[in-house]
Amino acid sequence: MIQVESMLEVADNSGARRVQCIKVLGGSHRRYASVGDIIKVTVKEAIPRGRVKKGDVMNAVVVRTKKGVRRPDGSVLRFDDNAAVLLNQNKAPIATRIFGPVTRELRGDQFMKIVSLAPEVL
């Protein structure tokens, strides 16, 4: 459950380390984002010579949450951190590598590139 002001780790090699959610996209008064939702973020920490700089405003897709994902069989998949992957204006990942596991819920036609780059799909 990601909301405005939530801090997330960045699960890719774009150069950002931590981002902060500034808007949950998909509705005028939408409050929470879960795995697979697109959010607007600002970069709070970045490494030198990365693709993004501190202060950049970008789109991101949530790939892991502490709250978890409920599957149709009743099981819940929870993670140790809240993480996102940065996207460009065309909703494609700007990075070439993804770190850590991602969930099967991202397998829609929109995020197959992220699923294919991920080392593990749960």
UniProtKB/Swiss-Prot annotation:
Superkingdom of source: Bacteria
Keywords for this protein: Ribonucleoprotein, Ribosomal protein, RNA-binding, rRNA-binding
InterPro entries tied to this protein: Ribosomal_uL14, Ribosomal_uL14_bac-type, Ribosomal_uL14_CS, Ribosomal_uL14_sf
Transmembrane segment boundaries: none
GO biological process, one term: translation
Alphabetized SUPFAM superfamilies for the sequence: Ribosomal protein L14 (SSF50193)
Name of the featured protein: Large ribosomal subunit protein uL14
Lineage: Bacteria, Pseudomonadati, Pseudomonadota, Gammaproteobacteria, Moraxellales
